[in-house]
Regions:
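Signature aromatic-anchored transmembrane alpha helix within multi-pass, membrane-resident enzymes
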Residues: 1-21
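C-terminal luminal/periplasmic domains and tails of membrane-associated envelope-modifying transferases
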Residues: 16, 26, 33-212
Length: 212
C-alpha cells in the first residue's frame, strides 16, 4: 500500500507542475498589459503630449522604435515627466537644488499629493500607473503615507481613461508579491504585465480649454 501511495503522490506532484507550466506558457503567449496601454496611448494621446509614466516600463516605451519623432528633443513620441529625479528624500524631507537620482525601488517614497497640483499647473495631464509600483505602497502604507495620499488625490482629480488587468475575468487580484508580478505563477493571471491604469486630470491646464 505504501508504494502505491508514494506513486500517487508523485503523480499528483507532477500533475501540479504540468498545470502550472501550461498556465505560465498560456499567460506569456498573450499581449502584455504594458503593450496594451501603449497601443491605447498611441491611438488616443497625440505626439508631444506631456505624460507622467511610473517606472514600470522601459524608457523606450515612450518611443516608436526606429522612427524617432522630430517634435521632441530626444525623439520620443511623448514628453515624459522626470520621475528619475526628485526633490523629495526617502525620509520625506525636501532637498535643495536639482534634487537626486531616484532608484526604481525608492520611487514610491518620492510621491506626495502636491505632485498632482504640479501636473495640473504644468500640463502633465496623462498619468500612467502600474501595480508593480503602486502595489509596493499599498503593501506597506505605513512606510509611505504620502504615496497613499498621492494616489487618493490622483483618483479624486482624474478620470480613468484606460485600464488593463492581467487577471482572468472573475478572479480576485493577487496579493502584491514582487516575484509573482513577473513570473505569473498564480492561476488568477490571464496575461503578463502589471495592472495598468491611465488617468486624465481634469483641472488646471488639463481642463477643457486649459491649453494642455
Amino acid at each position: 500500500l505504501r508504494p502505491a501511495l508514494y506513486a500517487l503522490g508523485a503523480v499528483l506532484l507532477l500533475g501540479q507542475g504540468v498545470v502550472y507550466s501550461l498556465h505560465d506558457g498560456l499567460v506569456l503567449s498573450r499581449p502584455d498589459t504594458r503593450n496594451l496601454a501603449r497601443t491605447w496611448m498611441a491611438a488616443n494621446v497625440p505626439p508631444k503630449t506631456k505624460i507622467v509614466v511610473e517606472p514600470v516600463v522601459p524608457d523606450a516605451w515612450a518611443s516608436d522604435i526606429g522612427r524617432p519623432y522630430p517634435g521632441t528633443s530626444n525623439g520620443a513620441r511623448w514628453v515624459k515627466f522626470p520621475t528619475s529625479r526628485s526633490n523629495v528624500a526617502n525620509d520625506g524631507s525636501i532637498l535643495p537644488g536639482g534634487g537626486r537620482i531616484v532608484n526604481i525601488e525608492d520611487f514610491e517614497r518620492t510621491l506626495f499629493p502636491g505632485l498632482v497640483d504640479r501636473y495640473e499647473k504644468e500640463g502633465w495631464c496623462y498619468v500612467v500607473s502600474g501595480s508593480t509600483q503602486r502595489g509596493r505602497a499599498e503593501a506597506a502604507p505605513g512606510e509611505v503615507p504620502q504615496a497613499i495620499a498621492y494616489y487618493r488625490a490622483l483618483e479624486s482629480r482624474a478620470d480613468v481613461v484606460f485600464h488593463a488587468s492581467p487577471y482572468r475575468r472573475g478572479a480576485e487580484p493577487v496579493t502584491f508579491n514582487f516575484d509573482w508580478s513577473f513570473d505569473f505563477y498564480p492561476l488568477a493571471y490571464a496575461r503578463p504585465g502589471p495592472e495598468m491604469t491611465v488617468y486624465r486630470l481634469r483641472n488646471g491646464r488639463c481642463a477643457p480649454g486649459g491649453g494642455a
